[in-house]
């Protein structure tokens, strides 16, 4: 009698397997001995660059040049070995650098250096991911971002002023590369979003503190002729500061219902202070778009809040003198003392749009050149309308890229909104998603009257909301992490039983 053994294990034996971490992300190689040599080279290059800049711009203090370039070199080393750390540091410090120009730095701008560093490090990181097999197929929104950049390249090539357009293309490249990097890491592990939000929250500290100092001590009259003291925080213009605040404050508000008590109090304080400074920028477009975003957010949290927000906005508009005069001044054609207004009213914008529209006939296909409108008008100003700017400066190609990006983002936002309404998300995911939609809508509303298209610092933070919505919509292999941090079990049970038929002896 011959017994044939099968490979199957008896039914009584449990096969325990190590659970695969659902949310773990890939690890890149750790620094080796070569890192010390690379750091030494970075220090030498930083000092050499500082001496070079010193010879070109002798009025710039050497300590600022050397310190900035050394910091950039060190940050670059961090990015080559730990890109997530690099990304978080960049998001935390970028708002502090926007206005570091002119007196202290001359033509030397730390924000520009950080942008170039972000391009180089992020490009190397993405290439490294692809070479290592870690690259994930971008979402449709990722492809839309790439198309947005590619379709503006002809605009740069045929630009009437390539010097101006060159800087704008660098800014656009940094936006697209950072978006792709954020999307890739969220596809790896959606919990990374929490770290991004924390880093971005830390980035609000310097602009808020600077804004308060300006409001109480060092504020200056608005050069646009409004007669008001407008604050710009650490940004180059009050409108940019207001756009940044409208997006950031809405995201913070959306997080409040998901936090523990002590963190909730911090978020409430931060959103209150941010809203106060937003009012103090006297940027009317940002006021209206922020109100729109808060109404949308309130409609998903508690519909009774809608009436409270409308009533509060009305009281501020009527009761605060500066706000009331700013709203009344919206359609005025003259400034204080009867002086003609420059760029401070809807009427001026309509007139300016009419004057610059003939520029579209110069090169209908690729436009006059990205960021080149201001070089062709006596006012030397941007179009103050991002839709018009995309067509005038990018031509038909640029407009296709920009409108396609907006269409794909709108589709993603609509899909996420519908899923949130159906209750398909956990508590935290729901509020973050709705907050991202409200914040993005708030900025999108400013595209009609503000220069948002090439506002690099704003786009860097819009990328967070865009990438979150894209991963939720199309990242089928990536699930949003639960509120706790423990790893979830795989969908398939690790306990397997052998079917009875597989454990029989054959004679």
Outline where the language-model segments fall.
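Aromatic-anchored transmembrane helix interface
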Residues: 112-116, 140-149, 162-184, 204
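Alpha-helical transmembrane segments of multi-pass inner-membrane proteins
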Residues: 3-4, 36-38, 42-48, 71-76, ...
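Hydrophobic transmembrane alpha-helices and their immediate junctions
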Residues: 263, 396-442
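Membrane-interfacial loop-to-transmembrane alpha-helix junctions, especially the N-terminal start
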Residues: 79-90, 133-146, 193-199, 266, ...
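N-terminal signal-anchor transmembrane segment
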Residues: 32-125, 154-158, 443-445, 461
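Long extracytoplasmic/lumenal interhelical loops at the membrane interface
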Residues: 221, 231-233, 328, 336-397, ...
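Transmembrane alpha-helices of multi-pass inner-membrane enzymes
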Residues: 45-48, 119, 307-308, 434-507
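Short aromatic-rich membrane-water interface segments that cap or initiate transmembrane helices
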Residues: 99-105, 227-239, 341
């Amino acid at each position: 009698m011959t017994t044939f053994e099968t490979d199957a294990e008896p039914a009584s034996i449990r096969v325990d397997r190590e659970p695969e971490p659902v949310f773990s992300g890939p690890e890149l190689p750790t620094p080796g001995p070569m890192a010390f040599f690379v750091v030494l080279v970075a220090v030498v290059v930083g000092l050499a660059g500082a001496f070079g800049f010193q010879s070109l711009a002798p009025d710039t203090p050497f300590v600022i040049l050397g310190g900035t370039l050394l910091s950039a070199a060190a940050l670059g080393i961090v990015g080559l070995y730990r890109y997530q750390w690099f990304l978080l540091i960049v998001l935390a410090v970028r708002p502090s650098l926007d206005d570091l120009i002119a007196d202290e730095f001359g033509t030397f701008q730390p924000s520009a250096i950080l942008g170039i560093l972000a391009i180089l490090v992020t490009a190397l990181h993405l290439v490294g991911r692809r070479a290592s097999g870690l690259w994930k197929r971008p979402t449709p929104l990722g492809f839309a971002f790439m198309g947005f950049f590619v379709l503006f390249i002809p605009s740069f090539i045929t630009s009437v002023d390539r010097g101006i357009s060159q800087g704008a293309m660098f800014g656009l490249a940094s936006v697209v590369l950072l978006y792709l990097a954020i999307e890739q890491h969220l596809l790896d592990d959606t919990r990374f979003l929490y770290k991004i939000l924390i880093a971005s929250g830390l980035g609000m500290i310097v602009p808020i503190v600077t804004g308060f100092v300006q409001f109480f001590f060092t504020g200056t009259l608005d050069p646009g002729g409004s007669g008001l003291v407008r604050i710009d925080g650490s940004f180059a213009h009050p409108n940019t500061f207001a756009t940044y605040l409208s997006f950031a404050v809405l995201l913070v508000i959306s997080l409040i219902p998901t936090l523990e008590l002590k963190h909730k109090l911090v978020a409430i304080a931060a959103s209150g202070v941010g809203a106060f400074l937003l009012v103090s920028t006297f940027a009317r477009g940002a006021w209206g778009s922020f109100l729109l975003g808060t109404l949308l957010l309130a409609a998903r949290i508690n519909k009774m809040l809608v009436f409270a927000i409308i009533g509060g906005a009305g009281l501020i508009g009527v009761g605060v003198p500066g706000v009331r005069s700013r709203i009344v001044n919206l359609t005025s054609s003259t400034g204080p003392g009867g002086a003609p207004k420059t760029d401070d009213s809807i009427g001026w914008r309509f007139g300016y749009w009419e004057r610059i529209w003939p520029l579209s006939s110069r090169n209908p296909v690729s436009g006059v050149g990205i960021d080149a409108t201001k070089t062709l008008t006596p006012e030397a100003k941007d179009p103050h309308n991002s839709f018009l700017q995309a067509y005038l400066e990018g031509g038909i190609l640029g407009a296709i890229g920009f409108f396609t990006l907006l269409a794909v983002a709108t589709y993603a936002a609509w899909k996420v909104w519908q899923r949130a309404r159906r209750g398909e998300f956990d508590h935290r995911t729901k509020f973050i998603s709705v907050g991202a939609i409200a914040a993005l809508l708030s900025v999108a509303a400013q595209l009609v009257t503000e220069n948002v298209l090439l506002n690099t610092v704003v786009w860097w933070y819009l990328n967070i909301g865009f990438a979150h919505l894209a991963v939720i919509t199309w990242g089928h292999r990536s699930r949003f992490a639960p509120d706790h941090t423990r790893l979830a079990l795989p969908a398939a049970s690790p306990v397997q039983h052998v079917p009875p038929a597989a454990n029989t002896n054959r004679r």
